[in-house]
Amino acid sequence: MEEINAMNYPKLEINLRKLEHNARLEVQKLAKYGVTVMGVNKVFNGLSETASAIIRAGIDVVAESRVSNLKKLQHLPCQKCLLRTPSPSEIEEVVRYTDISLNSEVAVIQSLSREAVKQKTIHQVLLMVDMGDIREGIWFENREYLEKAVKQTLELPNLELYGLGTNFGCYGSVNPTVENGRMFVRIARELEAKFGIRFKYISGGNGTSYHLIEKGTWPEGINHLRV
């Protein structure tokens, strides 16, 4: 009976050598365009072997959408990123087990600051802007709230502004284009001018943006992808 059940379960075979090779090619290719890669370790259920493979390939930030998975990677020599906005009940663990998180709510950013002060650590915020995909982020036309979120992240103690990010090709099937990429960069530049800062990273989405690189039309200013 056990053998029959085992045969019915799906099985995922992972070639770590090929994973490392492909990740290294990705890092090298995107580096030619001035783009840094955040390695997404989703699907593998927090498997440290796959995370280690992409770290060996040159990726220094590993991202997951579950805090429980990031707990499993604490021993690895990389920064850890929660690939979504934390829920209020997760704040303590997010600050303890992650270095970076995606954020779009001022109240959550304030909670992260309070907890980071309590834990005597620094937490980095990747502030998300919704450019029409309706997946996550502050709506790009809601400039007042966006500016408030930037201001809070800059002023609250024990927080650092990791960068400005957006999503394409997810929930709303809004594909990345030269036009919306440039619009996103323009928003980033306007925020930089207002606050007298320079975003370390302007994160332009995920693997759906690859076609712009293949076409040689990569929007100037986007220097980060979550892949």
Language-model features: locations:
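Hydrophobic faces of well-ordered beta-strands that scaffold small-molecule active sites
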Residues: L12, V35-N41, V62-E64, K80-R84, ...
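A charged N-terminal "starter" segment
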Residues: M1-S87, E93-T98
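Active-site-adjacent beta->alpha loops and helix N-cap segments on the catalytic face
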Residues: H21, L70-L76, A107-T121, S173-M183
